[in-house]
From Swiss-Prot:
May play a role in DNA repair. It seems to be involved in an RecBC-independent recombinational process of DNA repair. It may act with RecF and RecO. The keyword DNA repair applies. This is Recombination protein RecR. Belongs to the RecR family. PROSITE patterns: TOPRIM.
């Protein structure tokens, strides 16, 4: 069945969201139109404002409406000479939720992927190199995803940091707390054995 052009456009627009197929998009559109137009207007306003006003921090590249994000602008960060390199702004939120890191971040907004046309320029590595060359960074902590692309990106950045004589470390990978060994994949288990620590 064909809907009106505006309803079709709404359904198609909702499909741009990750994990939203035609049926889910249709359900969302109908929910907003049938039962919650007020929320639909609020969503439209928030989306419009965010798309217009949210940009990237000039220092770390995470999302912000200001020139500097709250983390980079804060004078209360205890270890401002530490930079944790992550792939996405969501990674920053995950690390911040843990409350164990008080340094700064650098958000790549992706990972190296030559087949997809993503190289060092697309990841803002010239800005990261500027930070490294400033002499204000004592350690770079690489927290890219444990994938082939994430590992390649980490090695590329590690080589870059070593040229500036900056210490480089990578977050540990292994068995999750509370996890059972029988459910852990062999690669993760191998990383756990290789990264074991003395007690």
């Amino acid at each position: 069945m064909k809907f009106s052009p505006l309803v079709d456009e709404l359904i198609q627009s909702l499909r741009c969201l990750p994990g939203v197929g035609p049926k889910s998009a249709q359900r969302m559109a109908f929910q907003l139109l049938e039962r919650d137009r007020k929320a639909g207007h609020k969503l439209a306003q928030a989306l419009s404002s965010a798309m217009s006003d949210v940009g990237h921090c000039s220092s770390c590249r995470t999302f912000t409406e200001e020139s500097l994000c709250p983390i980079c602008a804060s004078s209360r960060r205890g270890n401002s000479d530490l930079i944790c390199v992550v792939e996405t702004p969501a990674d920053v939120l995950a690390i911040e939720a843990g409350g164990h890191f008080s340094g700064r971040y650098f958000v790549l907004l992706g990972h190296l992927s030559p087949l997809d046309g993503v190289g060092p320029d697309e990841l803002g590595l010239s800005l990261l190199e500027t930070h490294l060359a400033s002499g204000e960074v004592s350690e770079l902590i690489l927290a890219t995803n444990p994938t082939v692309e994430g590992d390649a990106t980490a090695h590329f950045i590690a080589d870059m940091a070593k040229q500036h004589e900056v210490n480089v470390s990578r977050i540990a990978h292994g068995v999750p707390v509370g996890g059972e060994l029988e459910y852990v994949d062999s690669t993760t288990l191998a990383l756990s054995f290789n990264g074991r620590i003395p007690l």
